[in-house]
Amino acid sequence: MFPGGISMTELIIILAVILLLFGAGRLPEAGRALGEGIRNFRKALSGETEVKEVKAEDVKTEERKEEKKEEKEKVEA
């Protein structure tokens, strides 16, 4: 018996139903999505957030690239 009162027979039945619902092809995809959801849930509980630091230099560089691209498109048109 596993923790939570689930026997081996019940676990096999649950896994068979999951296999029938998702199919063998989509099962890895579903597992990946489930794992990502659990990870995001844990991050939310611990208060972690993804914050990307952007330096002013990086922003200026991106703006220059966009301006050059726009100028090039105007010249080509």
Swiss-Prot record:
Subcellular location as annotated: Cell inner membrane
BP terms from Gene Ontology: protein transport by the Tat complex
Identification of the protein by name: Sec-independent protein translocase protein TatA 2
Gene3D superfamilies: 1.20.5.3310
One Gene Ontology molecular-function label: protein transmembrane transporter activity
Keywords assigned by UniProt, alphabetized: Cell inner membrane, Cell membrane, Membrane, Protein transport, Translocation, Transmembrane, Transmembrane helix, Transport
Spans annotated as Disordered: 52-77
Membrane disposition: Single-pass membrane protein
Gene that specifies this protein: tatA2
Lineage: Bacteria, Pseudomonadati, Aquificota, Aquificia, Aquificales
Function: Part of the twin-arginine translocation (Tat) system that transports large folded proteins containing a characteristic twin-arginine motif in their signal peptide across membranes. TatA could form the protein-conducting channel of the Tat system.
Subunit structure as annotated in this protein's UniProt entry: Forms a complex with TatC.
Family, as annotated: Belongs to the TatA/E family.
Membrane-spanning parts: 2-22
Cellular component aspect of the GO annotation: TAT protein transport complex
Domain of life: Bacteria
Primary location group: membrane
InterPro entries for this protein: TatA/B/E, TatA/E
Presence of the UniProt keyword Cell inner membrane in the record: yes
